[in-house]
Amino acid sequence: MTQSLKGRSVAVTGGSKGIGKGIARVFAQAGAIVAIVTRHADQAEAVARELGHGAFGVSGDVTSLASMEAAMREVNTRCGGLDVLCANAGIFPPAKLEEMTSEQWDAVSDTNLKGTFHSVKAAIPYLKKSNQGRIVLTSSITGPVTGFPGWTHYGATKAGQLGFMRTACIELAKYAITINAVLPGNIITEGLAGMGEEYQRTMAASVPLKRLGHVDDIGHAALYFASKEAAYVTGQTLIVDGGQIIPESLEALAQA
């Protein structure tokens, strides 16, 4: 069944590039009115023009609660409401644990974890009025499911998002607001593309499906959580990694 979000309003944080842009594109194609929320208003507007379907850009910094409150207020004013929040904004600068500074830790935590809190808190007053409010977090397999060297701070924030989600889903249930999370594996984004073709081939070889994911793969997973078909789903995760977390020994056994 093809999910439709025709006429519903959606805010996507970090929606001007990478996974966020993929989510925004899939939602726009499903008929939603998409607000691209990012610190860089010019980038947001450029993506909105590219998407069409009534999409528009909104300036908002997830590290500031006041900024996110202003952004969600603008989305509500321009759309006449807010039905879906995709809390996607995140950063992942590599840093080895022994060499990591407090400033590096704080930068990742402020964006990925506190930014999720700010985005959700700012959206709640409007989602409550929707009577079918949806929150979709972009988490990761790194942290909640597995580890990856050089991203201790990132993994901690992504695991923290799920702890936040599992408590928030209980508090928000009385408003008929659901909150779920998509856990991407290795997805082709600007960041991964910058690591070179050899690195991409190595990563793809480690995936049972023998390819890297596309941003639209994450967009379609998020679309399910935002759809009416997922009305009875909350506090849950969906891993989208091509089978990457399956132990190599089990994959080898399956191919025997």
Q: Where on the chain are the PLM-derived regions?
A:
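Active-site helix of classical SDR
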Residues: 120, 157, 165
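C-terminal helical subdomain
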Residues: 174, 181, 197, 201-233, ...
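Conserved glycine-rich cofactor-binding loop
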Residues: 16-18
